[in-house]
Amino acid sequence: MCAIQRGLLSLARSAIGYNSTPSRFSSTYRHTPMHRSCTRIAVAFLLLLSAFTNAAGAATAASQIVESELPNGMRVIVKSDHRAPVVVCMVWYRVGSIDERSGTTGVAHVLEHMLFKGTKAVPAGEFSRIIAEAGGRDNAFTSRDYTGYFQTLHKSQLGLALRLESDRMVNALIAPDEFAKEIKVVMEERRWRTDDRPRALVYEQLNAAAYRAHPYRNPVIGWMSDLEAMRVEDAREFYNAWYAPNNATLVVVGDVTAEEVLKLARQHFGPIARKTLPLRRITQEPQQLGPQDLTVRAPAELPYVLMAYKAPVLRDPDAEWEPYALEMLANVLDGNEAARLNRTLVRTQRIASSASASYDGVARGPGMFHLSATPTPGKTARELEEALRGEIAKLIAEGVTEEELQRVKSQAVASHVYERDSMFYQAQQIGSLAMAGLPHRLIDLFVEKLKAVTADQVTEVARKYLVDSGLTVAYLDPQPLSGKRPAAPPPGVRHAQ
């Protein structure tokens, strides 16, 4: 199996509910009871895999994106892709941890759990069973900016998915007994996902320091003290405030037409009344006035360093080309085995066992450019920080060669093309852009914007944003291992990004 095939197989697994890791700093997990035979699982998987493993060029032949809005304010976005009789159906709510009140961190994620705990029409646990019996897979995810629910299934079952989703948009029970059980699941999830994982602790602590005022400083899964104090009324209040058609976007990608989807959307979501949404009062992040660092002491085998620089995002009115140049900068540093960090720190100097750079410009709040690395035995996290700084200084002083940039561009564009061959990835792109307040036309513009980035622009964004005045550094100081970390998530874990 070639690298491209492995990548497409991974995308297909992600699309049908396998554990996946969408980014360096966000893990996605959920265990859902599946009451169906191995044969049905195999058939569903092969059906979906066939949809994702056609030639990459097929993605460009797909129909254009069609967007509509129901009278109640719900957005409906459809992208036809007729390569297989499959649809990916996603309902996105523009509410995440960014919208939580102080003292209730984690409630967006807890509510995501509760929406699988039944309505008057669909008892607890039945949602996933019904989708499974129809030959599909369902899942959900919570992030800083949004909460999403999705199903991947045969196109003939789209109406079933929309009926179930419209039901829980307004009829979720959020019963006290189910909440009491589920909050314990979430607390155990936090222990497994963060408290027992030293690098996750480093990332959590860095965010809390780097964002002084903005709610991005809070973990999506919530602080343990807030989870322990959370009441069922908190989840109900959050649900009643934010789960409304005028705060939701339906995204469907697959073997359907826009007319078919819109007809079903009107049937199932049209009768739901719009709501007056709460006023979003999000504290703006003050300007950082100097570098800051912190040390996290936790049981671990190796040290680790994580660096975060304040950076713009696509929705910033003055950003223009800068987010695309930052994307190219991340690829120059860490786009492949021959990229600068791996070539210099790992293979030549051998002071790091791994080193990475990452940037994500799709967000409702302020952005970050991350560098991270694990030192080799005998080296410290602070020594590795200096080496990372040295690579940045060298790039700023000497610039990026045109040959280097063209190689990175080719790889980035190829990766984007193959990712777009996945129906699930297409739906993810459309939904995440919508939640950030960005037009879906950016999907088609993305490759051209990357191609237009110049070597001077890559150097310029490095010089402008990778500076001490916007830097926060977190070091992991490994402590003796006191016990074995759980190898698998606890039962009932759902998505939290």
Task: Show where each model-derived region lies.
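Bacterial N-terminal signal peptides that target proteins for export
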Residues: 7-11, 21, 29-45
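Non-catalytic beta-strand/loop surface segments
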Residues: 57-97, 121-157, 193-247, 271-316, ...
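Acidic, Ala/Val/Gly-enriched low-complexity intrinsically disordered segments
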Residues: 3, 12-15
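Bacterial N-terminal signal peptides
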Residues: 42-54
